[in-house]
Amino acid sequence: QKNFSLLLRIWSKIAPSYPDWKLEIIGDGALRPALEEEVVQLGLSPSVELSRPTQEMQAVYLHSSIYAMTSRYEGLPMVLIEAQQMGLPIVSFACPCGPRDVIHEGEDGFLIPLGEEDAFVRALRQLMDSEAERQRMGRAARLSSARYDVDTIMAHWIQLFDTLSVTPSSTPIS
């Protein structure tokens, strides 16, 4: 689902041109040994860090410049909202749902047609080449994330319940 092998292939096309940049993948699980081997096979050991899960994700986001997601499918990925809250521009495949609901194309990130590896590379390069673009999209991302704020969501729920409570029922309840 997360398609980390594709992310590593994409990174292998970018890393030689950006020796000061690092790709950090955070997680654990059954696929970790295969990913570790793939990092070595692609010669990416100097530029890829496979980190264990942490409770300090806020610190990770604060030390990041871009959030990249190569998932083939998602629900509503909280990691995208968290990344936006921390002011990170996002590059993600436009899965059938999830990222399309969070990212505004060209404003706070890039939605790449599913499987278009070269387009993903171009979007990452565009952001990596321009700190001003990262900052502009990061500010927009932070503003976009406000729609998921607890107070905003609660206001929508209250409005919905208020509407439902004053709308007469067309079917009597017995």
Predicted features and spans:
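A short alpha->beta transition loop at the rim of the catalytic pocket in nucleotide-sugar-dependent
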Residues: Q58, S65, G87
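C-terminal alpha-helical cap of glycosyltransferases
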Residues: V150-S174
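A short, well-ordered alpha-helix in the C-terminal region of glycosyltransferases
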Residues: A119, Q126, E133-R147, H156-Q159
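Short hydrophobic beta-strand element within catalytic cores of glycosyltransferases
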Residues: P89-F93
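Conserved acidic donor-binding segment of nucleotide-sugar-dependent glycosyltransferases
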Residues: H104-G106, F110-E117, Q126-E131, A146
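Aromatic "clamp/platform" in nucleotide-sugar-dependent glycosyltransferases that forms part
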Residues: P53, R72
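A conserved mid-protein helix/loop that constitutes part of the nucleotide-sugar donor-binding site
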Residues: Q1-K13, L23, A30-E36, D118
